[in-house]
Amino acid sequence: MSEGEAQAPRGRGLPPDVLAEQVELWWSQQPRRSALCFAVAVGLVAGCGAGGVALLSSTSSRSGEWRLAVGTALCLLALLVLVKQLMSSAVQDMNCIRQPHHVALLRSGGGADALVVLLSGLVLLVTGLTLAGLAAAPAPARPLAAMLSVGITLAASGALLLLGLLLYQVAVSGHCPPARTAAPTTRSDRSGNGSVFSISGQLSAGQRHETTSSIASLI
């Protein structure tokens, strides 16, 4: 029973140190946030890519200028989000980053994802408002209905992205635990390990005493 009590604190004290040294596990922290940000990234790539291809494929002589510009911007935006996701996956697979703050920046749900969503929302909002403003100016050769509908759709999508990012940042800052709370735990674990070693030394001394007594009785 004493050996089990001596091994129990050691088993409880080792995992935090072991987990802290495993860089691969830093990428999988906070899986819910990672899954949410990955879903948003997939939605951005699919939505912007499909919208850009649709605008580029429907380009005609009457609406060639704005459809070509907006379609190209949407395709580039989808490519930017895709490159960020591929870069994070490549860095994680190569395991070339050893700093915790760098991992927290590049992993799914980190600061880089928030920056990409912010940039995407601003681009969509500005593009949508620009199209809506151009559609408000009457011109005989300009398809006002199509331009206005595309502008309103892009502006609404950008506003929703920015609002969702704001709510996400508020929720993350409200539920984020302080980073300095891990230091007392480490000290207590180390002190616990020290007591385990002293107890195990006493146990080994007691076992040697019992062994010596049994040999003397046999003689």
Swiss-Prot record:
GO terms for cellular component: membrane. The chain crosses the membrane at residues 36-56, 68-88, 114-134, 147-167. The keyword Transmembrane applies. It holds the Pfam family TMEM125. Keywords: Membrane, Transmembrane, Transmembrane helix. This is Transmembrane protein 125. The gene is TMEM125. It is a multi-pass membrane protein. It comes from the Eukaryota. It comes from Bos taurus.
